[in-house]
Amino acid sequence: MPSHLLVLSLLVALLVVVSCGPGSDHGWGYDENNGPDTWQGKCQNHLKQSPIDIRAPDVDYALLHRMHFLNYDMDGKIELSNTGRTLFAGGFESWQHKQPMIQGGGLKHRYKLAQFHLHWGQNDAVGSEHAMGSLHYPAELHLVHVREGLTLKEALSRPDGLAVVGVFLAKTNDPVANKFSPISERLHDLRHSGNKTELKNFRTKYVLPLDTEAFYRYEGSLTTPDCSEAVIWTVLAEPMAISSHQLHLLRQLHNKELVKSDKNYRPLQPLNGRRIQYRPSKLDRAMICSSFATTSVIITYVAILSAMLI
């Protein structure tokens, strides 16, 4: 074979390996030609997909301990980047012994924070991936944790390999309530796909609401390809505040096609028989316990009365 044909054959083979190899990027996105309706594999044919609509008939109260956010008050350096699909924050592994983690709250393992990213919509009526009674928030933040002792590849093959905390973002005009500023102040540097910037002295508690006691829990999946069903989801009941201007800055980020990325959320997926657990706050728990106590007294009274009549 002539040398130039041999080189050409090798180049073709290399292109096949790169385009079809594991973990390759097949150009998925959120536009009409590459959006969620076109995602293949697990995204199309598996039964425990995310996100979901959290509706009262599908929710059960759960007597779970509170979830602990370890090292979330420690500070460190993170890298913010515009991936062309989302605003991404990583670098937590370099924090070493200060790396944020979660445990408790019904989780059977401890999980280390690997990254967080955001989803948003083109207006305030859409944007969050999860919904509450079919109603959406304008944005949602996902804190992705990997089970301690596992690599990311190993975690993706386990039904509880990842623990993702979902935080709703609610619009507010109160500057005191807004903790999103350390990130939003850097969005001007991240306008184009591929842009990166460092953020020093960052505390992960900046992206948590004040109350983390109440949450919803269910088994689900990644909300992006390959949609692996490896996620224990914790969706916090209390949202975090974000301003109209900050939402505007998110919607100005450009995707890989160099156009404004005004939406990057996956549509709601069917529950397919799954149940959602709700871990209430202190106030809610007191009301529930009071209700249980009253019910217990009534049942006991009826039992005694029945015994007397026999």
Curated annotation (Swiss-Prot):
Superkingdom classification of source: Eukaryota
EC number: 4.2.1.1
GO molecular function: carbonate dehydratase activity; zinc ion binding
Pfam families: Carb_anhydrase (PF00194)
Binding-site positions, Zn(2+): H117, H119, H142
PROSITE patterns recorded: ALPHA_CA_1 (PS00162), ALPHA_CA_2 (PS51144)
Identification of the protein by name: Putative carbonic anhydrase 5
Organism: Caenorhabditis elegans
Keyword Hydrolase belongs to the record: no
InterPro entries for this protein: CA_dom (IPR001148), CA_dom_sf (IPR036398), Carbonic_anhydrase_a-class (IPR023561), Carbonic_anhydrase_a-class_CS (IPR018338)
Residues annotated as signal peptide: 1-20
SUPFAM superfamilies recorded: Carbonic anhydrase
Example of a GO cellular component annotation carried by this entry: extracellular region
Compartment(s) of residence: Secreted
Record carries keyword Ribonucleoprotein: no
Annotated keywords: Lyase, Metal-binding, Secreted, Signal, Zinc
CDD domains xref list: alpha_CA
Limits of the Alpha-carbonic anhydrase domain: 26-280
Binding site for substrate: T223, T224
Enzyme class of the recorded protein, top EC level: lyase
Catalytic activity: hydrogencarbonate + H(+) = CO2 + H2O
Purpose of the protein: Reversible hydration of carbon dioxide.
